[in-house]
Amino acid sequence: MTTPISTSRAASIVSSILPYSRYLKRVLENESELQQELLEQLHNPFTREEMLGFLQDSTAHLIDEADLHRLLRQLRKRVILRLAARDLAGLADLNEVMATMTALADVTIQFSLEFLHAAMVQPGHFGKPKGEKTGTEQQLLIVAMGKLGGGELNVSSDVDLVFIYPEDGETDGSKSITNHEFFLRLGRKLIASLNDYTVDGYVFRVDMRLRPYGENSPLAISLPMLEDYFVTQGREWERHAWIKSRVITGSSIAEAALMELIVRPFVFRKYLDFEAYEAMRSLHTQLRKEVDRRELHDNIKLGPGGIREIEFITQVFQLIRGGRDADLCIRPTLGVLQRLKQKQPLPEQTVEELIEAYYFLRKLEHRLQYLDDQQTQNLPQHSDDQILIAKSMGFTDYTGFLKHLDLHRQNVTRHFEQIFAVRRKAIKLGTFARIRPEQTNDNEIVKVFSNQLKTLGYIDPDKITARVQQFYDGTTFRQLSHPNQERILELMPTLMEVVTRFPPVEITLERMLRLLEKIGQYSAYLALLQEYPQTLPRVAKLVSISQWASDYLGSHPILLDELLAPSGLHTLPDWPTLKTELIHQLHHGNIPKAQIIEWQMDVLRHFQHAQVFRLLAVDLEGNLLLETLSDHLTALADLILDNVLQLAWQGLKKKHRKSPAFAIIGYGKLGGKELGYVSDLDIVYLYQDNHPDAMEIYTKLAQNINLWLTSHTSAGVLYETDLRLRPNGTSGLLVNSIEAFSLYQHEQAWVWEHQALTRARFVIGDSEVGEKFEQMRKNILCQPRDMENLKREILMMRTKMLEAHPNSTPLFDVKHDHGGIIDVEFIVQYLVLGYAHRYPQLTSNIGNIALLKLAGELGLTSAEKANAAFIAYRELRRTQHQLRLSGIPEATGTALPKDVSQKFARVTSDYLSSARRAVFQLWEDVFGT
């Protein structure tokens, strides 16, 4: 609440600030009745409600458009008087100034439109415009652009407007005209009500040049015309212009939402749009030429280091990332800067300096305009005005003021040039090897290229030259658009040099070329590599180590963005923080309702892919235990399942309670917390609910969950799922009550199903259902069993698994063959099922290594052999993991095809002989065979 100011104090304040505004002084001298009103209300901001009240109090006296013009101008005069006085006196901050001017524009436009529309549809006139398809009455959608759209209007600003109407059709009055003609006439009248200069002044100058097709086009167009324009003719600079667009009038929220469906996809691409850099450079170059031509170097908006450059900085990040990050799809410049500060695509100090400069420049802009109520951003040339401006900005002299101004402008210029630097021009020639497709048959040029490769350090330059020729001659490259071919050609010299740093060079080059083939159709990602050439060595390093990393990047090229700030790639995830971040992303998208599910699906996939990629980067550094990696991959899956369960439940139309009495049970690698990068999720769904429709509801919920996980969207898949471990397998019910599941486990389950239960755990969902499952699991595992029968059943199952995965090669299959991973898992499962009735601690879900150690400590098998076996198990899993990552099991001495090495992880029989021996010895100790 504002503190009242006495009239005498207010008079003193007004007197002190009048030298800084000749406009205020002139108005108060000519219209003395406004002075008392100003003194009485100086302590109060001029609110939207007060503006509306002023207009509505005079509605009864409005007869014609002349009355409307007069009333709007009287309001404008009062608002400017109080706002200027409050601002110059230090009673209003920048946010109040921008908000008040924006409110004035919104209120006057809306009031004027309502009055004029009502007059045009009166009986005996044109009548109401009706849509030819819907038959509903049509209203003019006025789209505020620029500073008005962003809620940051200055005190003597144009208002940039675009007029849209929903449908073509005709009016229903006696003087029927087309909707197009109706809204043209309405638009002209509205512009006149704001823009025309009368004895009472004006309200706002109106600029319509941002409308589709520009100033030579119709004043108003239909929504279908707008959509067609964006799809067929929309230009890059118009994406920049429409960032701040805001619908300020219209007949319904639905029409505003329709605008969102049309405008948002045009402005914000679904991918990371690094091409925006080049578009912004081009736009800024044009602006600089205009500044030079018009000699606007002292213009604090358009000149170097001015307001426009700050806006360009914020908007380039919005255009690049807004399609992925809805937090950046906001309008105010300061708001975007604050979010850039939080998200840190720019250093915090950079953002702070930009914010400080923006505040200073906008404050100065307003003081320049207060002088004579002129739309100017030029520094004054007359010495008297220079002194006034300096003092109004809090400086004793103009020299000191200029020094401070120059500091801000230099900061803005420096940051702008760093962000928009033409990095590609920095590629030096020297020894960089380059050859173009049309030159691959020119023997002389090919020879020069080969010599350049030799200089760079390539051992077999002729072979590499042939591979590059093959790349250029390949169908994939030839089918790319010409601009994308040129982008790749610009990248190639740098790529050829970078590859030499990461042996084995031939393999690294091959993977880089294949990666380029995969991402070559996406100009945005090629632009990323051009704008940030430092990412190329980071990519080369990853792919040189891992074929799987190369394939993953090729499948999800959006992950190249993760390499821009590599510091984040070298730290393990903070899951509580990431959980908060994911929830925010999922539920703060400001996405049209019709698109929200697709949006959330993509958010989940982008999040999951990014976390996997970050873990991969840490993993490839060689400092991450496989168990730790699996723990993190499992934590990621748990987090995804938690959110998917909630989203799937929210999406159910038929439900009878706030939250489901439902649990997701993890089996296999998910249950045992041993997930790898591409592991399926083995899942069973349970519920406990006596509602008569419970089975139907939870079946639909389970189907929805599976849909969320396995659907192929533009961002790929979250997880493949395996639901076959539920009671009766694929022929069984998709969901089971906890009672039915317990009965099945006690009376019908096979031994192999109890083996699977040893690795099961409650993952997410209703805690009561989860607790009952865990208790039931423990009861089942702790049942006394006939040891000979148990042994026979487990050995039979092991034989079946060997038959299902025959190995006809002389190589050792690390997972499936005897002495491998599955042998260890079967040993553990046998010990748990055989002895848990005596040692319930064996039912703890602590992983195979810890259970082997515990079995040895309990004397269930030789402690020495158990310890040797868990060391072997760790080595087997590590080898399997490394082979699948590399795609080339170099340790075997055999270059296997990728599909074989990655699917089966096989090595020469002598490579893991000590580990196999340890497993064999424990197997013999436990099973006697």
Swiss-Prot record:
<dbReference type="GO" id="GO:0000287">
    <property type="term" value="F:magnesium ion binding"/>
</dbReference>
<dbReference type="GO" id="GO:0005524">
    <property type="term" value="F:ATP binding"/>
</dbReference>
<comment type="similarity">
    <text>Belongs to the GlnE family.</text>
</comment>
<keyword id="KW-0460">Magnesium</keyword>
<dbReference type="InterPro" id="IPR043519">
    <property type="entry name" value="NT_sf"/>
</dbReference>
<dbReference type="InterPro" id="IPR005190">
    <property type="entry name" value="GlnE_rpt_dom"/>
</dbReference>
<keyword id="KW-0808">Transferase</keyword>
<dbReference type="InterPro" id="IPR023057">
    <property type="entry name" value="GlnE"/>
</dbReference>
<comment type="function">
    <text>Involved in the regulation of glutamine synthetase GlnA, a key enzyme in the process to assimilate ammonia. When cellular nitrogen levels are high, the C-terminal adenylyl transferase (AT) inactivates GlnA by covalent transfer of an adenylyl group from ATP to specific tyrosine residue of GlnA, thus reducing its activity. Conversely, when nitrogen levels are low, the N-terminal adenylyl removase (AR) activates GlnA by removing the adenylyl group by phosphorolysis, increasing its activity.</text>
</comment>
<dbReference type="Pfam" id="PF08335">
    <property type="entry name" value="GlnD_UR_UTase"/>
</dbReference>
<dbReference type="InterPro" id="IPR013546">
    <property type="entry name" value="PII_UdlTrfase/GS_AdlTrfase"/>
</dbReference>
<keyword id="KW-0548">Nucleotidyltransferase</keyword>
<dbReference type="Pfam" id="PF03710">
    <property type="entry name" value="GlnE"/>
</dbReference>
<dbReference type="GO" id="GO:0000820">
    <property type="term" value="P:regulation of glutamine family amino acid metabolic process"/>
</dbReference>
<feature type="region of interest" description="Adenylyl transferase">
    <location>
        <begin position="429"/>
        <end position="929"/>
    </location>
</feature>
<keyword id="KW-0547">Nucleotide-binding</keyword>
<feature type="region of interest" description="Adenylyl removase">
    <location>
        <begin position="1"/>
        <end position="422"/>
    </location>
</feature>
<protein>
    <recommendedName>
        <fullName>Bifunctional glutamine synthetase adenylyltransferase/adenylyl-removing enzyme</fullName>
        <ecNumber>2.7.7.89</ecNumber>
        <ecNumber>2.7.7.42</ecNumber>
    </recommendedName>
</protein>
<dbReference type="GO" id="GO:0047388">
    <property type="term" value="F:[glutamine synthetase]-adenylyl-L-tyrosine phosphorylase activity"/>
</dbReference>
<keyword id="KW-0067">ATP-binding</keyword>
<dbReference type="GO" id="GO:0005829">
    <property type="term" value="C:cytosol"/>
</dbReference>
<keyword id="KW-0511">Multifunctional enzyme</keyword>
<dbReference type="GO" id="GO:0008882">
    <property type="term" value="F:[glutamate-ammonia-ligase] adenylyltransferase activity"/>
</dbReference>
